[in-house]
Amino acid sequence: MNIQSLLGRTAIRMAPLLVLCATPALAQTDSIGDLISKSGVIGWAIIGVSIIALAVIIENFITLKRDKLAPPEVIEEIRGLFDDEQFQDAMEICENEPSFFTAVCGAGIGKIGHGYDVIEKSIEEMGDEESIRLHQKISWLSLISNVAPMMGLLGTVSGMVEAFNSIASSGGQASPAELAGGISKALLTTMFGLVVAIPVTASFAFLRNRMVRTIIETGAIIEDLFERFRPESN
């Protein structure tokens, strides 16, 4: 396992614990529930976004495995059928075993007999289409990693407005206790936004790199399968 993979897995597994570790001093006097309550509506919204992010991470961590995108047993079976020139049977497998590999390979099989250029174009088009679909699945993580800090910043501004309103309403004589609520909300929402954004960003990078690597490897396998249809140069 390389360093990048190890860091990605660690970020995904440790994401739920970051909130607990982010403010140990606060945790000594307030529970996590108390901190969330003090952060107000925006804090709860950030927590909701974090739950969505965790669900997306888990779902993609499972479905973007290489064995899911390009099942080795299916690859070997189709390779054997290609060697026996049983292309119709290979097409049936592609239709019955949905995956990135079978979708792209099936597009090429459907154009056998139309010339290598047509086959190659069909494979490239389906490969692009499937790649976009996979990118869309993890694009939510990129969105969340950008939105969460902005939500935290919004909470910060809201909290500071409350603090200054307290000063204004007291004629400039607001006590520290009166200011504490607004300032606390300002700091907590910023913290929650960053606590969500950091592991989500790491998870997005890990899943994206895994997906790109698998797409490249699968493309090489498919290219090798259809190489037999390439006309020999004179």
Predicted regions and their residues:
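Pore-lining and gate-forming transmembrane alpha-helices of multi-pass membrane transport proteins
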Residues: 177-204, 208
